[in-house]
C-alpha cells in the first residue's frame, strides 16, 4: 500500500543548532556501535553511521516539561544498551540546562544513513512502520521507499 503523510511541526523559537562538546563526546563514544535497525557497523576511518536524537530533538528542548519527562523516563530504557535512562539524571538540573540530556548518549540511537535520513529512515517514515524494519524476516522489506 502506498502511503503519504503531510503535516506541520511547530517547534519553539531556538538558536541555530550547533554541536555541543557533549554531542561531540557522545558521537565519539557511540561511533562504532552498530545501526539500531540493520546492525551495520562503521569501519576504522569511516563515519557513515550517525547518531539520532531519539526521545527529544534538540530544537524542541525549550518546550519540554523536563520534570514530566523525567518522571516518564524512570521507566524508559535505552534501545541499544538496555540501560535505564531516567535514573541517570537530576531532572531539575536538566530543566535548567536541557543539553545535559538532549546531547547525551542516553538520548541517542545509532543509525546508518539509510535508516536515519534516507528514504526509509526515521526522519521520513512513521515510527510504527520504521521499527518493523528491525524485525523483518530475511529478504523481506516492510518499507521500500518510492515505487
Q: How would you name each of these model-derived features?
A:
Residues 20-85, 112-114:
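Short cysteine-rich loop/turn motifs with clustered Cys
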Residues 60-66, 70-147:
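Polybasic, low-complexity binding patches
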Amino acid at each position: 500500500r502506498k502511503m503519504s503523510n503531510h503535516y506541520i511541526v511547530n517547534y519553539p523559537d531556538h538558536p541555530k543548532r550547533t554541536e555541543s562538546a557533549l554531542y561531540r563526546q557522545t558521537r565519539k563514544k557511540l561511533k562504532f556501535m552498530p545501526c539500531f535497525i540493520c546492525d551495520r557497523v562503521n569501519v576504522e576511518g569511516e563515519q557513515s553511521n550517525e547518531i539520532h536524537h531519539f526521545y527529544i530533538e534538540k530544537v524542541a528542548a525549550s518546550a519540554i516539561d523536563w520534570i514530566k519527562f523525567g518522571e516518564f523516563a524512570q521507566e524508559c530504557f535505552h534501545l541499544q544498551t538496555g540501560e535505564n535512562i531516567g535514573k541517570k539524571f537530576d531532572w531539575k538540573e536538566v530543566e535548567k540546562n536541557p543539553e545535559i540530556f538532549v546531547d547525551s548518549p542516553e538520548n541517542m540511537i545509532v543509525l546508518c544513513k539509510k535508516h536515519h535520513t534516507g528514504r526509509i529512515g526515521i526522519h521520513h517514515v512513521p515510527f510504527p512502520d520504521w521499527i518493523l524494519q528491525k524485525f523483518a524476516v530475511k529478504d523481506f522489506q516492510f518499507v521500500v521507499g518510492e515505487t
